[in-house]
């Protein structure tokens, strides 16, 4: 617990937040810091206790008084803080590096007699894996090497080996602790005596092969011969060498750490996770001997080629999808009006000999293959020719997201026999469903133009049903920006109606919708951008002075009426005589008693 002083150069923000106070029955402390802020650069930490602010004792201050005191500091902020005691950290557990130490127990000098063996070329003293340093029984289980995987279980009698049984090999006492044996070789255990014959200890049994071809039999016999003779050709990596120190005069712990590490790394090369198509070591050895190691790879390649040949090209798939998505052409009765024609989803009217503007059907929902109608304004002639699909899609028109235009649902015959909402008769055959009612297709007509609305959009207005064109002509309001009819959500502002996408903020371009907005030079601004561009910031709390807020001007700044207070006692100075020191307002009591 140490005290220290901090002097932060103004202006605000200072980069920290307070918590506590007299009203919370807890001392004022630093609750949070802003990354890279002035407080963080001054080595202020979270949890430090604030003792004084600009020379005033902070122990009796409430939270609001301390906040106003800090806000009143404009040029610089001087504070005295008390460092919070650091919580004791648990000591880290040391990580053991390197190999664990071996515990070697004293053993008698005279080692037990080791029976003579004829050869040590193929001896496998490797034991079953166990944690380092563990003590096990002297019995050793021999693990066959990959080269001896196909040796017969019983030693066969050959012309080079004696018919007498081979004695079992007893490992030295040092093998019990997981280390290689280091023993003096006696006269009867000389290297020349150890290389007199061959042995086969604990080799796996292989069943007799009776139904294989002659070539496979020869390859298997060759593998058996290499395994029994200790051939130096290995299937997985370089051959392993036993590390034995000879001609030592005393027993000691062998220093084989580097070699053991290397051999341990070689043994664990195949311990990584395998995928579903990776074979184990035994299967790879068998595949190499039988010559089938590349068979599955070729089969996998053929399968990939077959799959690739079956996948259609992107252009073909897109063309098929577009063909499937095209609706069936339906003939609809038309009246004598020269502006309405039955079109497909991608059709649009193309003006001829005029500079009219094509109006896209804004009521149409995306991904809906339905007929649409177009209307050309300021044009004297109409043409029934159909323009390309991209001619209508390339134009950017304001879209009505919440459109009022609906479409009738076509129901085939045979499912049910509803009642027509127009004639109140039973419908036999296909019918339409709209607004929760059923209609004869020939009786679902516009209330004004009497055209069928079976394949076009309709809008319900004052209890009657109108087609899209009649509703747009007689009922739909006009947008104050694009001068087009609004078929969806209407924004009413500034005594005009707007599309949602047309009534946007001038600064950020986002739709204002029903939110608060401000006008500046006749242009609408959202609340955030307006205060950022044109708003007045209070010098005390650094918040904008909104419309309707009481404010005053003093010392060349603008203040909220509640923010213009004495920097020491936080007494309101509105309408009172005040003094100023370094742009900080002071009351009469503290004008000459406080030095900044």
Swiss-Prot record:
Q: Where in the cell is it found?
A: Postsynaptic density; Presynapse; Postsynapse; Cytoplasm, Cytosol
Which residues does the record list as N6-succinyllysine (modified residue)? 89
Keywords in alphabetical order: Acetylation, Cell projection, Cytoplasm, Isopeptide bond, LIM domain, Metal-binding, Phosphoprotein, Repeat, Synapse, Ubl conjugation, Zinc
Q: List this protein's GO terms for biological process.
A: actin cytoskeleton organization; cell growth involved in cardiac muscle cell development; heart development; muscle structure development; regulation of dendritic spine morphogenesis; regulation of synapse assembly
Task: Please give the tissue specificity annotation from the record for this chain.
Answer: Heart and skeletal muscle specific. Expression is commonly increased in the brain of patients with bipolar disorder, schizophrenia, and major depression.
User: At which residues is the cross-link Glycyl lysine isopeptide (Lys-Gly) (interchain with G-Cter in SUMO2) found?
Assistant: 89
Q: What is this protein called?
A: PDZ and LIM domain protein 5
From what organism does this protein derive? Homo sapiens (Human)
Source organism lineage?
A: Eukaryota, Metazoa, Chordata, Craniata, Vertebrata
């Amino acid at each position: 617990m140490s005290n220290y002083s901090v002097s932060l150069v103004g202006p605000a923000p200072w980069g920290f937040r307070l918590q506590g106070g007299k009203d919370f029955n807890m001392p004022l402390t630093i609750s949070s810091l802003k990354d890279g802020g002035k407080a963080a650069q001054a080595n202020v930490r979270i949890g430090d206790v604030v003792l004084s602010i600009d020379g005033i004792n902070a122990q009796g201050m409430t939270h609001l008084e301390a906040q106003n005191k800090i806000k009143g500091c404009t040029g610089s902020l001087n504070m005295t803080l008390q460092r919070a005691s650091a919580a004791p950290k648990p000591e880290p557990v040391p990580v053991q590096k390197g190999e664990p130490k071996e515990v070697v127990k004293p053993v008698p000098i005279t080692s037990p007699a080791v029976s003579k063996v004829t050869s040590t070329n193929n001896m496998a003293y490797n034991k079953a894996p166990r944690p380092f340093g563990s003590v096990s029984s002297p019995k050793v289980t021999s693990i066959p090497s990959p080269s001896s995987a196909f040796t017969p279980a019983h030693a066969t009698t050959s012309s080079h080996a004696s018919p007498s049984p081979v004695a079992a090999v007893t490992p030295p006492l040092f093998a019990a602790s997981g280390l290689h044996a280091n023993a003096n070789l006696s006269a009867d255990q000389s290297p020349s005596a150890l290389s007199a014959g061959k042995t086969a200890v604990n080799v796996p049994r292989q069943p007799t092969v009776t139904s294989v071809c002659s070539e496979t039999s020869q390859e298997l016999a060759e593998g058996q011969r290499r395994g029994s003779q200790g051939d130096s050709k290995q299937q997985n990596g370089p051959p392993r060498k036993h590390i034995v120190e000879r001609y030592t005069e005393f027993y000691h712990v062998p220093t084989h750490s580097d070699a053991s590490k290397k051999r341990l790394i070689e043994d664990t090369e195949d311990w990584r996770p395998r995928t579903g198509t990776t074979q184990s070591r035994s299967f790879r050895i068998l595949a190499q001997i039988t010559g089938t190691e590349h068979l599955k790879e070729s089969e996998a390649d053929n399968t990939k080629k077959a799959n690739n040949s079956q996948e259609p090209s992107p252009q073909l798939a897109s063309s098929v999808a577009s063909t499937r998505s095209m609706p069936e052409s339906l003939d609809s009765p038309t009246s004598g009006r020269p502006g309405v024609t039955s079109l497909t989803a991608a059709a649009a009217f193309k003006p001829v000999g005029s500079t009219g503007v094509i109006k896209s059907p804004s009521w149409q929902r995306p991904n809906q293959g339905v007929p649409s109608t177009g209307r050309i304004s300021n044009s004297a002639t109409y043409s029934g020719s159909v323009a390309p699909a991209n001619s209508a899609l390339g134009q950017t028109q304001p879209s009505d997201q919440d459109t009022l235009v609906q479409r009738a649902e076509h129901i085939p015959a045979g499912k049910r026999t509803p009642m027509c909402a127009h004639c109140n008769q039973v419908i036999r055959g296909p019918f339409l469903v709209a607004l929760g009612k059923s209609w004869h297709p020939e009786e679902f007509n516009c209330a004004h133009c009497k055209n069928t609305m079976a394949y076009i959009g309709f809008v319900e207005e004052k209890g009657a049903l109108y087609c899209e064109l009649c509703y747009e002509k007689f009922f739909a309001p006009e947008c104050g920006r694009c001068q087009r009819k609004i078929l969806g959500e209407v924004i009413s502002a500034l005594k005009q109606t707007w599309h949602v996408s047309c009534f946007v903020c001038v600064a950020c371009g986002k739709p204002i919708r029903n939110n608060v907005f401000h006008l500046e030079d006749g242009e609408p601004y959202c609340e955030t951008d307006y205060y950022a561009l044109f708003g007045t910031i209070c010098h005390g709390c650094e918040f904008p002075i909104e419309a309707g807020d009481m404010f005053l001007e003093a010392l060349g700044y603008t203040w909220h009426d509640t923010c213009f207070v004495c920097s020491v006692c936080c007494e309101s100075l509105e309408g009172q005589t005040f003094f100023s020191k370094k742009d900080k307002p002071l009351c009469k009591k503290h004008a000459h008693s406080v030095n900044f």
